């Protein structure tokens, strides 16, 4: 467990390496992005609750923490859980975590880079067309000893919010996995079936030495060699011909031109015939044609030629020599293997963030790496579940304040509340209904009539919510008795996983609980 307490710098080290790009490794970027541990500036939750913050935009960042002893996932569940808070949003960049592989050579924090071997990469990433929650694991080929990245198919979409978001990955020994966002399941599947490239190669492959015979005929249809062009087939007949049945309309002025010189136009005084040439009056539509059926020479309209046949070609027939589509013969795959337990990942020696982003002030907090999903859930209940209530109330208050400042009035405030509800419902429909039941009811009543909608949403605007923030000395203060007991129990159990648990879980506070209660009472 990592909560970024005051002694965090004793455990975490920034990288001094450079990231090389291009095939010839000629372009290098130093990992000089700044890291800091501080409280959030946007929608702060619990008093004194700080996290690891990526401070620089458009820079390479790398920071890591090595465990006292490696975590071995073999034969056990593996849980990866952490919080992300996108204080400035996420327009282009990553916010994922890497579980670093425990290798014989070991991991040197000063040299941590994109080349450092990792076991799992998990978390949000967005840039251009990319917008997904990564789940990548590196799998070792038992025949060659080489590692290959396996990417989850059809990944979940991340939650791009300025409030905290909880990402949880659970991998079971039966090779199943499940991804949760804010405790809601977003993606589940099997390591053996839902990754690309697949863990296990095919049992048979095309024979690379097999070649298509020179006399192989793979043209299914051919022109009939016995067919001849009919004697009455006229290839020169035009596609269209004049309509001989057409009659010139009455009133057609065939002797009148469509345009005439403008009788009112006069040659400009500055016009010089020697320099500018002979002057001609500009043309205007012939006024006599306005009421007539038409002017100028009458021409018959054209129609499709019934005798037209076009160029003759022989009809197609089945090719008597056709042998079908040629395919090489298959042979047993010499590189075939079957790994039935890819969830037996390589031992994990530490965690790290190796990121590039165009958005600064991305905050990470409350990291859990272990074997017990119930422990992770209990840890989230004492941390994330408490702060998110406070953060969402602040977000709602800010949204309402902005609507008032913009002079949106009653209709604008209704729209603001509805937009907030819709935004939350896209990520968590049930949670949105619980948090904003009046808006949910109002939208439902809209199907019965506009007046009902206005009345119900008006009820929403009748009251405001207040959030009281109280502080105590120190970064982390004592949790409520029951919560504190749960947190200590989680910390003691997690020690067996090899992950450092600093001073037990100390982020939940009586003050924090009081803030939630006060906010509810103020309503």
From Swiss-Prot:
The keyword Endoplasmic reticulum applies. The keyword Transcription does not apply. Residues 221-231 have a biased composition (Basic and acidic residues). It is a single-pass membrane protein. One of its GO terms (biological process) is ERAD pathway. Keywords: Chaperone, Endoplasmic reticulum, Membrane, Transmembrane, Transmembrane helix. GO terms for cellular component: endoplasmic reticulum membrane; fungal-type vacuole. Residues 462-523 are cytoplasmic. Residues 191-275 are annotated as: Disordered. Residues 1-440 are lumenal. Disruption phenotype: Leads only to slight reduction of virulence. Severely affects growth and displays an altered morphology, when the calnexin DNJ1 is also deleted. Its main location: endoplasmic reticulum. Induction: Expression is increased in the absence of DNJ1. Belongs to the calreticulin family. Endoplasmic reticulum (ER) chaperone that functions to stabilize non-native glycoproteins and retain them in the ER until they are properly folded or targeted for ER associated degradation (ERAD). Is essential for avoiding plant defense responses in cells with defective N-glycoproteins processing. With co-chaperone DNJ1, coordinately functions during the tunicamycin-induced unfolded protein response (UPR). During biotrophic development, the UPR-associated function of DNJ1 appears to be more important than that of CNE1. This is Calnexin. It comes from Mycosarcoma maydis (Corn smut fungus). The lineage of its organism: Eukaryota, Fungi, Dikarya, Basidiomycota, Ustilaginomycotina.
